[in-house]
């Protein structure tokens, strides 16, 4: 009779864990972080002057380039991220100790029992440690995202922000870009590489079946967490 409550408790715990694991799998595997809100600085619209030849307002440049320079302009960011990192660590420690105690003597006569050196003793110890570790990581991202100029700083730099959301058959893919661009780095085709975006925040993630298939289950996450005894 004493085993029935414990067996029932074990079955209940397994059922609750499976239910919680199903709830986690049904949700988003990698929730997207919201972009930090940036309040655009909008320049006041100049009122037209009746009867004047010149009216202040946005200029219509017929001969210059059309690169982004004002708040609300669009700019294409070419994602050319390519990072590689590797690290190797080797540690080797060894130590050996030996202690030899010879037979003591009394007035020049060795102390023995029936001719046996019972007081003579020797000990030795040997300790060693050898550890090796290797790690390597490589990331590569290519593509393009068109962003919006949110602010124009006093020095002429542009604060940009934007995202691209792709709705695919097996889920969603989202790319977010945020940072600061120098106006001189913008190419004539109104594009800039991501390597020249200062304070860049580039996020890429997904939702759906493909993203869930690459995520560990709740039991695997437990054995890979700090709570695991193994």
Curated annotation (Swiss-Prot):
Top-level taxon: Bacteria
Assigned keywords, A-Z: Bacterial flagellum, Cell outer membrane, Lipoprotein, Membrane, Palmitate, Repeat, Signal
InterPro entries listed in its UniProt record: Flag_Lring
Phosphoprotein listed as a keyword: no
Membrane topology: Lipid-anchor
Subcellular compartments: Cell outer membrane; Bacterial flagellum basal body
Residue positions bearing lipid (N-palmitoyl cysteine): 16
Covalent lipidation (S-diacylglycerol cysteine), chain numbering: 16
A GO-annotated cellular component: bacterial-type flagellum basal body, distal rod, L ring
Molecular function (Gene Ontology), one example: cytoskeletal motor activity
Coiled coil: none
GO biological process, one term: bacterial-type flagellum-dependent cell motility
Family: Belongs to the FlgH family.
PANTHER family: FLAGELLAR L-RING PROTEIN
Protein name: Flagellar L-ring protein
């Amino acid at each position: 009779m004493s085993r029935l409550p414990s067996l029932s408790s074990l079955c209940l715990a397994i059922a609750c864990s499976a239910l919680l694991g199903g709830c986690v799998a049904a949700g988003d595997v990698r929730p997207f972080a919201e972009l930090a809100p940036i309040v655009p600085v909008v320049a006041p619209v100049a009122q037209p002057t009746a009867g004047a030849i010149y009216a202040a307002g946005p200029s219509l440049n017929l001969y210059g380039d059309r690169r982004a320079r004002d708040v609300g302009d669009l700019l294409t960011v070419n994602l050319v991220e390519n990072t590689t990192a590797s690290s190797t660590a080797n540690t080797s420690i060894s130590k050996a100790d030996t202690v030899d105690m010879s037979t003591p003597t009394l007035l020049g006569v060795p102390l023995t029992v029936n001719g046996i050196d019972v007081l003579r003793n020797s000990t030795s110890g040997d300790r060693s440690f050898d550890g090796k570790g290797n790690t390597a990581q490589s990331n590569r991202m290519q593509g393009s995202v068109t962003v919006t100029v949110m602010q124009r700083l006093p020095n002429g730099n542009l604060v940009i922000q934007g995202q691209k959301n792709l709705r695919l058959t097996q889920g969603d893919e989202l790319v977010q870009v945020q940072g600061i661009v120098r106006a001189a780095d913008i190419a004539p085709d109104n594009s800039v590489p991501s390597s020249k975006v200062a304070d860049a925040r580039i996020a890429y993630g997904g939702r759906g079946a493909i993203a869930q298939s690459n995520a560990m289950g709740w039991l695997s996450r437990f054995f890979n967490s700090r709570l695991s005894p193994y």
